[in-house]
Design a protein with these regions (language model features):
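Short, charged/polar micro-motifs that form catalytic or ligand-binding hotspots
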Residues: 11-22, 74, 78, 146-151
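A non-catalytic, helix-rich entry segment at domain boundaries
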Residues: 28-113
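Non-catalytic protein-protein interaction segments used by genome-maintenance enzymes to assemble
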Residues: 106-168
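Short acidic (Asp/Glu) and glycine-rich catalytic loops that position anionic groups and cofactors
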Residues: 2-9, 37-38, 61-72, 135-143
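Short helix-terminating capping/connector loops at secondary-structure junctions
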Residues: 101-104, 170-175
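C-terminal, charged and often intrinsically disordered regions of DNA end-processing helicases
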Residues: 1-31, 35
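Short, polar/flexible loop-turn hinges at active-site or ligand-entry regions and domain interfaces
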Residues: 8-16, 38-44, 169-171
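Short, well-ordered alpha-helical packing segments
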Residues: 2-3, 26-33, 85, 89-92, ...
Length: 175
């Protein structure tokens, strides 16, 4: 009677999943980028201590946005948060090294267009040309596959690049 008559069932318990980890990491990286832009102005000017501080703050802010009572509800989740901070420190270090090795500079973060959002757009101005690079943050291990692109199975980055190019052309109509 309780199950069929009243429709009672066991309460579902929330469990922090891989998708949640990806969402929090993504939000933390977004917050980190805005902090750098606002407070330091340039990724390459950050000291290692500042970079670690920004990562720590960004993760904590992203967790608060997500509902920190849930994320700190178990030892497992607390461990995942520590792991997430370490992973983001390595990610930010690698992204900084990539910027240092080239002439591209971040131009836009969380760039919204039609029905999507580009995580980051980097640009490099060279004379009368502007080169554009699209960065899509992923926590998984998916890699770019030219064959899948050719067969229309992996179009997201191409759509993002087209949108970024159109937006940059509006910014730099003379180039």
């Amino acid at each position: 009677f309780l199950t069929y008559g009243l429709g009672l069932r066991e309460r579902e318990e929330y469990d922090f999943q891989a998708a949640d980890l990806g969402n929090v990491c993504h939000r933390a990286l977004e917050r980190f980028s805005y902090k750098v832009e606002r407070e330091a102005g340039d990724w390459l000017k950050l000291t290692e201590e500042k970079r670690k501080q920004y990562v720590e703050e960004s993760v904590e802010e992203a967790i608060a946005d997500y509902g920190n009572s849930i994320l700190y509800s178990s030892s497992r989740n607390a461990y995942l948060i520590v792991r997430m901070k370490r992973m983001l420190e390595k990610t930010v270090w690698a992204l900084t090294k990539q910027l240092a090795a080239g002439d591209f500079k971040p131009s836009a973060y969380e760039l919204r267009f039609a029905n999507g959002k580009i995580d980051r757009v980097d640009t490099c101005e060279d004379g009368d040309c502007v080169y554009v690079k699209v960065i899509d943050y992923k926590t998984g291990s998916k890699s770019f596959d030219v064959t899948a692109l050719y067969h229309g199975l992996q179009l997201q980055l191409m759509v993002y690049m087209d949108a970024a190019l159109q937006l940059e052309q509006k910014k730099h109509p003379e180039k």
